[in-house]
Amino acid sequence: MNHKNKSHMKTLVVSVVIAMTSVFNAFSNGNLTQFAYNTTTDGEKVESQTVYTVKNGKYLQQHLKYNYTYDDKGNVSQKEVLKWNEITKVFEKQYCLNITYNAQETSIEYTAWDNKTGAYSDSRAKAVYQTTNAGQGFNYLSYEWNKKENNWNLAKEHAILYGDNALMADK
């Protein structure tokens, strides 16, 4: 895979992580329009980010917290999302995005926090991004966890090719 295709792949993965986080946050909360952020870093790596809602243009109210873990190559391997509980005044675990990489594929698994087990054990969805055709395209595969069968079921598949042969296909 050449440098340009790696760059496209990284951009695509980062975009999807941001989009997935936005979608999950939108479903878990109403129409919040203003946010403030406090980011904690270790060198160039983000360790955590606290998201505040801005009330009346001047008051900050804790909302979400993101914790990041990195693999030995410096790639984000886990993004943990915690939501502020107004009653207990603590951040509570909500879900985790586990990210794995190899030469031709990046996988992002969405796992919800399970209060009964005290762990991220409720797998719900997985997205897989594959480089295809010698770097001339990508496959996007979306899976949903089937609890009865205890395996992943393919929900959507999209193929994206670059150049004159551009094609997008839905399963």
Protein language model regions, located:
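Buried hydrophobic residues that stabilize the cores of well-folded domains
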Residues: 27-171
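Bacterial Sec-dependent N-terminal signal peptides
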Residues: 1-33
